[in-house]
Regions:
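Domain-scale detector for complete catalytic domains at protein termini or as standalone homologs
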Residues: 1-88, 92-142
């Protein structure tokens, strides 16, 4: 049975030793990672995550909540965690990857060996207000 959460790029290694689930950025899609299998050799299989409302799943409604998206993705990911695995997420994908990894802990599932997060901000307080809220004069002074 085909997994709608995983984009099959058709160039996966035959006998991988590790699986890397890749979560795309907001507005992105799983096909962004379709060429990555060629970059990582025969030991690592890249499994791009396809969100509802994107590309091959464009007819499905978007899931606007990160936690709900992680919960839904978890169901699609778990069947392919039968070997060592990790997560990579970029931007919004970093948030979804982090939340999904947290769910593995919450549900006492085998944990990813690695979680790579790129270009995602933290929840720290800003020192100054965001520039889009500044008046023209205040913006000139920054």
């Amino acid at each position: 049975m085909e997994n709608k959460w995983i984009l099959n790029s058709g160039n996966s290694p035959k006998h991988p030793e590790f699986r890397l689930f890749c979560f795309p950025y907001s507005g992105g899609s799983a096909s962004y990672y379709s060429g990555w299998n060629q970059l990582f050799g025969d030991n690592i299989e890249i499994l791009p995550i396809q969100y509802p409302g994107h590309e091959t799943r464009a007819d499905e409604p978007l899931i606007p909540d990160v936690r709900a998206l992680a919960e839904a993705a978890l169901e699609g990911i778990v069947p392919d965690t039968d070997m060592p695995f990790g997560f990579f997420g970029h931007s919004l994908g970093a948030l979804v990857a982090f939340e999904t990894a947290a769910l593995f802990t919450e549900y006492e599932l085998d944990l990813p060996q690695m979680v790579f997060l790129s270009s995602a901000g933290t929840n720290f307080d800003r020192v100054q207000p965001p520039v889009h809220t500044l008046s023209g004069e205040a913006l000139k002074k920054t």
